[in-house]
Amino acid sequence: MAKSSSSSSPSPAAASAATTSSAPPLPASYEAALQELEGLVAGLESGQLPLDQLLTGYQRGAQLLKFCRDKLEAVETQIKVLEGTELKPWVQE
């Protein structure tokens, strides 16, 4: 009987997985991610958020930053393919 009562409580790993699965999905575009990230930074810098929201905002910001960096890296790779293996510097006309 003791075995069944201990199996009813979720393990820390299961609780962690449940927390991460409830995270909002990543934005559909770089621009949407950047806009959300800018809003988060403004909220964090305001100093008006409670501590738990600061942590949540920081974690979401880290996700968005990784998303934006990955998108930029993918575009850079595509540009390299279009221009050969060497990325040429952009010159504004």
From Swiss-Prot:
Gene Ontology BP term (one): DNA catabolic process
Assigned GO CC terms: cytosol; exodeoxyribonuclease VII complex
Reactions performed catalytically: Exonucleolytic cleavage in either 5'- to 3'- or 3'- to 5'-direction to yield nucleoside 5'-phosphates
EC number: 3.1.11.6
Domain of life of the organism encoding this protein: Bacteria
Pfam families per UniProt: Exonuc_VII_S
Molecular-function GO terms, alphabetical: exodeoxyribonuclease VII activity
Compartment list: Cytoplasm
Subunit structure: Heterooligomer composed of large and small subunits.
Protein name: Exodeoxyribonuclease 7 small subunit
Source organism: Polaromonas sp. (strain JS666 / ATCC BAA-500)
Gene: xseB
